[in-house]
Curated annotation (Swiss-Prot):
Domain of life: Eukaryota
GO terms assigned for molecular function: calcium ion binding
Pfam family, one: TCTP
Organism, as annotated: Fragaria ananassa
Keyword Calcium recorded: yes
Cited function: Involved in calcium binding and microtubule stabilization.
Coiled coil feature spans: none
Highest classification ranks of the organism: Eukaryota, Viridiplantae, Streptophyta, Embryophyta, Tracheophyta
N-terminal signal peptide: none
Name by which UniProt lists this protein: Translationally-controlled tumor protein homolog
Domain TCTP: 1-170
Amino acid sequence: MLVYQDLLSGDELLSDSFPYKEIQNGVLWEVDGKWVVQGAVDVDIGANPSAEGADADADEGVDDQTVKVVDIVDTFRLQEQPPFDKKQFVTWVKRYIKLLTPKLEGEQQETFKKNIEGATKFLLSKLSDLQFFVGESMGDDTSLVFASYKEGATDPIFIYFAHGLKEVKC
């Protein structure tokens, strides 16, 4: 299994269990998330309640707490952040580029520098529709993960900066 860690913080942000599609000349990855239900307990002890005279709809004191979560957010313990306005986002991108560029090597660095402007404009065009997430450490100088919904979709898509991820074999 491959895990993708944030190059700046080491937080696990993605794994190969979630296939990605490269967008914006490979600078960004798009990953489909899914809403899932957690905590549902379905216990079947094989008894026939109607034969025992019990009400089939009786709860019998079991508190079955279910929660709907997005699989990627839950799996990698992503922490939602307040939304950014345009000025805050541009400030974050500039700092991110400054921190990330020295960690990239050769061709990767050139590709990143060449295409980051287009990727930034792409994200700016969607800014009001984006949700912002960081990894578990919640550091200030980390990669952001963006979530949004395509028109008419019920499940979110997640957008990652590809060059900000380090592939680690587990």
